[in-house]
Amino acid sequence: MGKSSFLQDFKAFAMRGNVIDMAVGVIIGGAFGKIVSSIVADVIMPPIGLLVGGVNFTDLKLQLKPAEVVDGVEKAAVTLNYGNFLQATFDFIIIAFSIFLFIRLLAKLNRKKEEVPAPAAPPAPSKEEVLLTEIRDLLKEQAGKK
């Protein structure tokens, strides 16, 4: 097993259709996630924050230990930032719901494609058509022998 065999195997693996499709899906999914996160953070959450008393969810935190100054050096407060968790949870729910709707739409479109019947095969020739075809072929044969 030489180096070139390893590289050829890797190239064959990387160029398979499903690997490339998956890579494209991951890239598009990342971009889609950013769009949905922006919609959640910038469009959906502000009105929800207003409804619950003007709260910005990302700012919600529980202070475990206050900030303190020791020997002229300020030590930051120790906080449990559960607001970020709430924001990420809302992002996840909306992204999952969006993907669910998209997959459901694709499944519906595929079902419609399957329901469309294939065009009917042309009917078999009648006995008269078969006889006329045989007569025509015999006449062509006789004309060819002359």
Curated annotation (Swiss-Prot):
<keyword id="KW-0407">Ion channel</keyword>
<keyword id="KW-0812">Transmembrane</keyword>
<keyword id="KW-0997">Cell inner membrane</keyword>
<dbReference type="GO" id="GO:0008381">
    <property type="term" value="F:mechanosensitive monoatomic ion channel activity"/>
</dbReference>
<dbReference type="InterPro" id="IPR001185">
    <property type="entry name" value="MS_channel"/>
</dbReference>
<protein>
    <recommendedName>
        <fullName>Large-conductance mechanosensitive channel</fullName>
    </recommendedName>
</protein>
<dbReference type="Pfam" id="PF01741">
    <property type="entry name" value="MscL"/>
</dbReference>
<dbReference type="InterPro" id="IPR037673">
    <property type="entry name" value="MSC/AndL"/>
</dbReference>
<comment type="similarity">
    <text>Belongs to the MscL family.</text>
</comment>
<feature type="transmembrane region" description="Helical">
    <location>
        <begin position="83"/>
        <end position="103"/>
    </location>
</feature>
<keyword id="KW-1003">Cell membrane</keyword>
<keyword id="KW-0406">Ion transport</keyword>
<comment type="subunit">
    <text>Homopentamer.</text>
</comment>
<comment type="function">
    <text>Channel that opens in response to stretch forces in the membrane lipid bilayer. May participate in the regulation of osmotic pressure changes within the cell.</text>
</comment>
<keyword id="KW-0813">Transport</keyword>
<dbReference type="GO" id="GO:0005886">
    <property type="term" value="C:plasma membrane"/>
</dbReference>
<dbReference type="InterPro" id="IPR036019">
    <property type="entry name" value="MscL_channel"/>
</dbReference>
<keyword id="KW-1133">Transmembrane helix</keyword>
<dbReference type="InterPro" id="IPR019823">
    <property type="entry name" value="Mechanosensitive_channel_CS"/>
</dbReference>
<keyword id="KW-0472">Membrane</keyword>
<feature type="transmembrane region" description="Helical">
    <location>
        <begin position="12"/>
        <end position="32"/>
    </location>
</feature>
